Amino acid sequence: EMFACTDATTDENVWTNVGAGTGDVAPYTFQGTSYGYAYGGDQQPSPGAINVIDKYSYVSDADATDVGDLTQASYGAAGQKSSTHGYVSGGRIGGTYYNTIEKIPFSTDSDGTDIGDMTAIKYSPSGQSSSTHGYTSGGYTGSYTNIIDKFTFAVDADATDVGDITLARQGSTGQSSSTHGYTSGGYTGSFIDIIDRFTFSADADATDV
């Protein structure tokens, strides 16, 4: 195989195969190109926690549609995505906390499936995604936690503890670049403005950037 760069957009190069063999090298697009999804949540004043999977188009402005159900109604979960599936990890309903990891396919409208567990029950962690793994950082387990959990997209399996963010907290926002995950803000008895960064290339603690 031989590849030529056909799009030199910064951080989004596309390399096209011009030799023998098949397959081109396209950029990893975190947010997807066709649809957005919303999983679960807390609907007030009733019925409370829900298990609905909503899907909405990026192509046209329109309402979301209900395309499936999670295995467990919950709110305060983290979200991750691979190129083929969306993931929901953790969450709670009332005083019950969850450590489950659910997977939802993008190719068909269907229910989620339970494919593994995080290392601990977690409410309100933040979610990050590389091209190969999903991450949850921080959260609340009965006390604030600083654990970074990592699970693979290649097989259905439990997460492993691969490091710590700099400060245990819940309610942070998660962001992802092609090389790093970020945990920003949060609450640990008071609101904080810390931005933590951890690398996808190695299992290590986050740093305050």
Where in this protein do the model-derived segments appear?
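Polar, enzyme-active/binding microenvironments
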Residues: 1-209
